[in-house]
Regions:
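Accessory C-terminal helicase-associated subdomains
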Residues: 436-556, 577, 623
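Conserved helicase NTPase motor core
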Residues: 4-16, 20-24, 55, 63, ...
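ATP-hydrolysis module of ASCE/P-loop NTPase motor domains
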Residues: 17-18, 78, 99-182, 205, ...
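Helicase C-terminal subdomain and adjacent C-terminal extension
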Residues: 611-631
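Helicase P-loop NTPase motor core
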Residues: 24, 28-36, 40, 263-266, ...
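ATPase/helicase motor core of nucleic-acid motors
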Residues: 261, 314-315, 340-467
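Conserved helicase core region in the C-terminal RecA-like lobe
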Residues: 82-92, 209-212, 237, 352, ...
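P-loop NTPase Walker
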Residues: 1-104, 199, 281-284, 598
Length: 631
């Protein structure tokens, strides 16, 4: 007799579900991986399904490997069941058909090499613009949504997209290259138009199990529909409330489509084995504000429902804390991190990489150990920070040629690169335009001289100012902030908020140092930490690092859990991020906030800023249903 004693009633119902399509709605911490592996065992041992006919699809290689390893602990059939990502499965289908050859898969560098020459034929282009085009092409191939695709491209390039897309596809075809997104399109066409191939794969996979079904895109859904046409045994596991990848083309609406088109049965895994009841209740108050979702009634496991216990001196496990400004919020975080038990896991979750690095830099200075899961670009390598540091080096008289080249026309100063001799200085530039032995008009020489003299006076002030005042002066008085706004309008309006956040971060960070040299050394030390991996570990093992606090973006925290979680900056423009009022955008941002809240097992603190009378900050709208948790 198959053992089901370790299953709760909902899990048991899902595991022993008979033939046909099933949508298993799996709330946070509800044991979905356990249920999937138990289902595979039940199919093999009770329904006598051949392991080779079972296909288990995940969204990442790590998830596929993890699930296969979990299954291997309970069964000797792990090597026979087909575990893989959408892309790896579709690649095998295309290989068998001969539509792709081994070695034809294009990596990121190869794709950049294909698109660079095409872009440069049209206009000057940066690596950032090339990357935005590749992202847009991938999004378009996955979704076919032209309007949203164009949002990913700088404004001045939008009219060029159709032509550049055609030229890129032509170049890719010439080298017989295939990228991940082509595989979806090719696979769908193969299964639609090639009856023998379609029938072979339909017979091959009699049962299809899909994890994280809320992250599926429409093309992936269509391929699953083709594969499942014969048997219709699709076991789709997901939670539409945790759908946070629309920027990759994910469409949680496919879950509703699956229920309609397949007439799928629905089962809800309602018991949360991770979080205390207070956290479950608070997170539900937030997510219930979303309208476009499957309604759910969730509860904590019996063990997590004991409310009489106090934790850290309070009977409630969820608290909202308000602070006047970011430094006050940071002081509170430092205090909490220093007093916590190192035996417990804890994490600070951020909406953006920038906010995460700001806290990481401060923890490093305070000697508080931390790890970062995701590989993240060093903020000090961002062009804005590099520009600011070039200004400071010019003021200090330690600048090199590259520093002048970076900022001569940020903002525009009428200065040509031809004015640069072997040794560059502001005085040398002024001499070049003053002597008038160049090819420029008298008016042009006069304007350049005026700009350089003003620049010299500005740099004299910067030279004698402490870093925070110096950076503020460069941004405001020297016109660097104005230059960024103009550039954002030309390239991509979506960059405006990101660049504004970076400038605010630089000003705040500069305030921790007395000299530019001291600040430069701190930047180098932080960069060294990232390079050596002191501040970053990959994989779930990092969760158990001795006494270290985990720093993660919300997206990177998905699937993880911690005893204590802090979510700083629960303010408008951060949660939800940006200025968009589109209902779809707000609902996704609310889901992101929900995912962050549901990472907590025992203790959850939501931190927000109130600002000052002159510069008020507004708490996130997502906190409105949580007023009773204010402390």
């Amino acid at each position: 007799m198959f053992n089901l004693t370790d299953c709760n009633p909902s899990q048991r119902e899902a595991v022993t579900f008979g033939e046909g399509p099933l949508l298993l709605l799996a709330g946070p911490g509800s044991g979905k991986t356990f249920t999937i592996t138990k289902r595979i065992l039940w199919l093999i041992h009770e329904k006598e399904v051949a392991p080779e006919q079972i296909l288990v699809i995940t969204f990442t290689r790590e998830a596929a490997l993890s699930m296969q390893q979990r299954f291997a602990q309970t069964s000797s059939f792990a090597g026979s069941v087909n575990f893989g990502t959408f892309h790896s499965i579709f690649y095998q289908i295309l290989l068998r058909s001969g539509r792709v050859q081994p070695g034809n898969l294009l990596n990121e560098k190869q794709k950049l090499n294909l698109i660079y020459p095409i872009l440069k034929k049209n206009k000057e282009c940066s690596a950032e613009i090339a990357k935005s085009f590749l992202d847009a092409i991938a999004y378009y191939k996955n979704t076919g949504e032209k309007e949203k695709t164009l949002e990913k491209i700088p404004e001045e390039w939008k009219n060029c997209f159709p032509q550049i897309y055609r030229e890129y596809e032509s170049a890719r075809t010439k080298v017989r290259g295939v990228d991940f997104d082509d595989m979806l399109k090719e696979c769908e066409e193969l299964l639609q138009n090639n009856t023998p191939q379609r029938e072979y794969w339909q017979k091959r996979f009699s049962h299809i199990l899909i994890d994280e079904f809320q992250d599926i895109n429409y093309r992936q859904y269509c391929i699953v529909r083709l594969l499942a046409e014969r048997h219709k045994n699709v076991f789709a596991v997901g939670d539409d409330d945790q759908a946070i990848y629309s920027f990759r083309g994910a469409r949680p609406a496919c879950m509703q489509m699956f229920v309609r088109e397949f007439a799928a049965t629905q089962i809800l895994l309602r018991t949360n084995y991770r979080s205390h009841q207070d956290i479950v209740e608070a997170s539900l108050l937030v997510i219930n504000e979303n309208l476009d979702r499957f309604p759910k009634i969730l509860e904590a496991s019996e063990l997590n429902q004991r409310k009489e216990e106090t934790y850290r001196g309070t009977a409630c496990r969820v608290r909202i804390k308000e602070f006047r400004d970011a430094p006050e919020q940071m002081q509170y975080l430092l205090h909490r991190l220093k007093e916590r038990s190192t035996q417990e896991t804890c994490a600070i979750l951020f909406r953006t990489n920038l906010a995460m690095q700001s806290v990481a830099a401060r923890l490093g200075r305070e000697g508080i150990p931390y790890v970062m899961k995701e590989k993240t670009r060093n903020i000090y390598e961002h062009f804005i920070v590099q520009d600011i540091m070039s200004y400071l080096r010019i003021a200090a008289g330690t600048a090199e040629r590259i520093d002048f080249l970076r900022v001569i026309n940020k903002p525009f100063r009428n200065i040509s690169r031809e004015a640069f001799g072997k040794h560059v200085s502001l005085q040398a530039l002024e001499d070049y335009y003053s002597m008038k032995n160049n090819d420029y008009s008298a008016d042009c020489n006069r304007k350049a001289c005026e700009a350089i003299r003003l620049w010299k006076r500005q740099m004299e002030f910067v030279k004698n100012a402490e870093p925070k005042l110096a950076v503020t002066f460069v941004c405001k008085a020297c016109g660097y902030e104005r230059y960024l706004r103009q550039r954002a309008n030309v390239e991509n309006n979506e960059k405006t908020q990101e660049w504004e956040e970076i400038l605010n971060y630089i000003v705040e960070e500069a305030g921790h140092f007395k000299t530019a040299k001291e600040w430069q050394e701190a930047q180098e030390a932080f960069g060294e930490q990232l390079r050596k991996g002191v501040a970053r570990e990959s994989g779930d093992n990092a969760q158990a690092a001795d006494g270290a606090v985990r720093l993660l973006t919300v997206h990177a925290s998905k699937g993880l859990e911690f005893d204590s979680v802090w979510i700083p900056d629960c303010n408008e423009k951060n949660f939800p991020h940006g200025n968009g009022l589109d209902p779809e955008h707000i609902e996704e941002e609310r889901r992101i906030f929900y995912v962050a809240m549901t990472r907590a097992k025992k203790d959850l603190e939501l931190l927000c800023l109130t600002g000052t009378a002159e510069r008020p900050r507004f708490p996130s709208r997502f906190l409105i249903p949580l007023n009773r948790y204010r402390r």
